[in-house]
């Protein structure tokens, strides 16, 4: 275990009763977050999931001390967020979903600018900037102005900037938004590396379910500003009793009413000669289900494990 890992406190985030409201131009108050309480271990990659408008970005903004809540207590890396904002900011960083940098500066100039804000100078600054440009494949674009970059390149620049101060805790808001598949994969590999090898705590929001399942040790699912589920991806799937999916492609007629009453069947949907049946015992249920397709010709059968996207759909209802 590295010295950096040993230095990290047991909890990266401790939140209790966090509430946030915004006022509209008409003076009306809208509640964005309601009574958010959770502890995030420094040893984990923690995911925030939920539909648009559920409060994920607002919560990350509060955790990263960009804004304050109206109510509740918050501790970051063992420090009270109210009285230690400067000390906390020296230990954390953030990559936003919609990066915004000085438009007239080049990639390299932007990284040097932020590096100096983080206290880097001389050879250390040059080396760190070069390392991050190489890590996020920005070297060939180092002389390109920010205003000329694609969405994906802007996102990669934001990630590179977030690593300049060697943070103990990093907040990632939709870290792979706008990235090509190969760069998305490399970004996920980098997130895993900086957590596993450098001992950096990671709190991230994402809409990409396979990404959350691949990276996150635990997940909080937000809906209408409240946490409606908090657990590991595996336990979320188990507790919601989503079951396995038997997917059958067929020609002809199937006895749908009999299928709905079949023991072990949790639900089904049929469309254009393909039926997806949720069951609590996949292979054990298969023989009884196939018998109810006696009047049809089955052309394909597939048994699928439930994934985090199934959890997302179930919790978002």
Where are the regions that the model predicts?
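Catalytic Walker B motif of ABC-type/P-loop ATPase nucleotide-binding domains
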Residues: 170-173
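ABC transporter nucleotide-binding domain
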Residues: 189-280
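Conserved ABC ATPase "signature" region
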Residues: 93, 112, 116, 123-141
């Amino acid at each position: 275990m590295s010295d950096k890992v040993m230095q990290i406190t047991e909890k990266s985030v401790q939140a209790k009763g966090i509430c946030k409201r915004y006022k509209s131009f008409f003076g009306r108050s809208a509640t964005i977050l309601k009574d958010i309480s959770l502890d995030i271990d420094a040893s984990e990659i923690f995911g925030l999931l939920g539909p648009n408008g559920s409060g994920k970005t607002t919560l990350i903004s509060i955790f990263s001390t960009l804004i304050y809540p109206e109510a509740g207590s918050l501790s970051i890396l063992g420090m009270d967020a109210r009285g230690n904002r400067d000390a906390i900011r020296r230990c954390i960083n953030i990559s936003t979903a919609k990066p915004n940098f000085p438009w007239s500066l080049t990639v390299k100039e932007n990284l040097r600018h932020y590096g100096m804000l983080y206290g880097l100078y001389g050879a250390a600054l040059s080396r760190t900037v070069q390392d991050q440009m190489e890590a996020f494949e920005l070297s060939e674009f180092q002389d390109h102005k920010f205003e000329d970059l694609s969405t994906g390149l802007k996102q990669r620049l934001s990630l590179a900037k977030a690593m300049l101060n060697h943070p103990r805790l990093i907040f990632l808001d939709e870290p792979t938004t706008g990235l090509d598949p190969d760069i998305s994969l490399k970004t996920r590999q980098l997130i895993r590396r900086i957590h596993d090898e450098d001992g950096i705590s990671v709190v991230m929001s994402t809409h990409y379910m396979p990404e959350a399942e691949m990276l996150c040790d635990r997940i909080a699912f937000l809906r209408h500003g409240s946490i409606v589920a908090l657990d590991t991806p595996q336990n979320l799937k188990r507790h919601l009793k989503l079951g396995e999916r038997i997917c059958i492609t067929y020609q002809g007629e199937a006895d749908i009413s009999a299928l709905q009453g079949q023991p072990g069947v949790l639900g089904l949907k049929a469309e254009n000669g393909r039926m997806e049946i949720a069951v609590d015992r996949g292979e054990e249920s298969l023989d009884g289900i196939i018998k109810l397709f006696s009047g049809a010709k089955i052309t394909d059968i597939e048994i699928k494990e439930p994934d985090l996207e199934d959890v997302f759909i179930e919790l978002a209802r």
